[in-house]
């Protein structure tokens, strides 16, 4: 399609190796053939299985790859659904080449694990965050996190008991050059709570600071 060609041309101009797929099934096959792929761009309206289902299937076996969903500006629920199925970010159509490239750049760096801290681990019972291999355990059990979820956990565990605004979290996790909306913070934290909280309806680890942001409850 024309939008796919537009994306491929601009990402190749930015220096990326790009693999194309016309359908959801083809995308999954090509990811199996190219397991070191760092970032996937998924249009929701794919022929065959849609972008949501492709995202779910990718996340079932791969938490490292960065996933960006392409959505229509008017479809707010599509953005939330995409993030809740495992996407790290979304870009609304129409978008500029600069915006898309900036989003891909940010996820590409994170998916490559470039930001590796000097210290080895952060322990706040029942959690253990290993900053060398970028993993999280709760009561000794590994919790599968995406790269964005890991980055959010790291921000919280480095700032125990401190109220962090949505803007601060956005800057620390997505970077100051991020073009998107604050909503992405809320949805990713909602997804993270599903993985770490004992009772999602009454969270005790990531608590909401109403009208401001969130706090790691230690």
Model-derived features with residue positions:
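Basic, amphipathic DNA-recognition helix from helix-turn-helix-like DNA-binding domains
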Residues: 56, 60-123
């Amino acid at each position: 399609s024309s939008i796919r060609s537009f994306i491929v041309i601009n990402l190749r101009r930015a220096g990326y190796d790009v693999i194309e797929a016309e359908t959801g099934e083809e995308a999954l096959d090509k990811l199996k053939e190219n397991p070191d792929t760092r970032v996937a761009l998924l249009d929701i309206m794919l022929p065959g299985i849609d972008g949501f289902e492709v995202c779910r299937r990718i996340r079932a076996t791969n938490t490292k790859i960065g996933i960006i969903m392409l959505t229509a500006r008017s479809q707010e629920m599509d953005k939330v659904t995409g993030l809740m199925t495992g996407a790290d970010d979304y870009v609304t159509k129409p978008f500029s080449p600069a915006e898309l490239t900036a989003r891909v750049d940010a996820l590409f760096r994170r998916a490559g694990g470039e930001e590796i801290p000097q210290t080895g681990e952060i322990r706040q019972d029942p959690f253990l965050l290993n900053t060398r291999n970028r993993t999280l355990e709760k009561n000794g059990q590994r919790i599968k996190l995406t790269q964005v979820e890991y980055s959010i956990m790291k921000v919280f565990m480095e700032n125990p008991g401190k109220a962090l605004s949505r803007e601060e979290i956005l800057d620390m996790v997505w970077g100051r050059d991020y073009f998107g909306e604050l909503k992405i913070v809320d949805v990713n934290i909602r997804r993270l709570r599903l993985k770490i909280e004992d009772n999602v309806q009454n969270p005790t680890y990531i608590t909401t600071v109403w009208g401001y942001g969130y706090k790691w409850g230690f």
